[in-house]
């Protein structure tokens, strides 16, 4: 019985830890090839301005693909070759928000996009 209670307590603690950090993406939608979209990621539960942030994506039936990254102060960025020149990552530390401006969209950009701490 003690083991069971310990296990339940551990699960409860881990659940609380997981709930502390929240990253909520928005801005997706349907767009024609060549169109544009801006994704947003609202962050809470941690000091956003202290962390580099990243975008990754997963196309239907495919694995995760790294898309872009930005340093904590926004001064340094990285782009995968597949999106370079078309996507722009940015952040607003005063709003705890990460952005991904996507232009000249292609069929192969179809994916679920995730922001990552």
From Swiss-Prot:
It is found in: Secreted; Cell membrane. Disulfide bonds join 41-115. The keyword Disulfide bond applies. Its main location: secreted. One of its GO terms (cellular component) is extracellular region. PROSITE patterns: IG_LIKE. Residues 20-117 form the Ig-like domain. Keywords: Adaptive immunity, Cell membrane, Disulfide bond, Immunity, Immunoglobulin, Immunoglobulin domain, Membrane, Secreted, Signal. This is Immunoglobulin heavy variable 3-64D. Residues 70-77 are annotated as: Complementarity-determining-2. One of its GO terms (biological process) is immunoglobulin mediated immune response. Residues 53-69 are annotated as: Framework-2. GO terms for molecular function: antigen binding. Residues 78-115 are annotated as: Framework-3. It comes from Homo sapiens. The keyword Repressor does not apply. Immunoglobulins are composed of two identical heavy chains and two identical light chains; disulfide-linked. Residues 20-44 are annotated as: Framework-1. PANTHER family: IMMUNOGLOBULIN HEAVY CHAIN. Residues 1-19 form the signal peptide. The gene is IGHV3-64D.
């Amino acid at each position: 019985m003690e083991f069971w209670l310990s296990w339940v307590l551990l699960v409860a603690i881990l659940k609380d830890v997981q709930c502390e950090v929240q990253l909520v993406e928005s801005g997706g939608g349907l767009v024609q090839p060549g169109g544009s979209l801006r994704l947003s990621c609202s962050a809470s539960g941690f000091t956003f301005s202290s962390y580099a942030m990243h975008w990754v994506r997963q196309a239907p039936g495919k694995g995760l693909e790294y898309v872009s990254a930005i340093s904590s102060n926004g001064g340094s960025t990285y782009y995968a070759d597949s999106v370079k020149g078309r996507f722009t990552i940015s952040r607003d530390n005063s709003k705890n928000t990460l952005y991904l401006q996507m232009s000249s969209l292609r069929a192969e950009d179809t994916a679920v996009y995730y922001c990552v701490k």
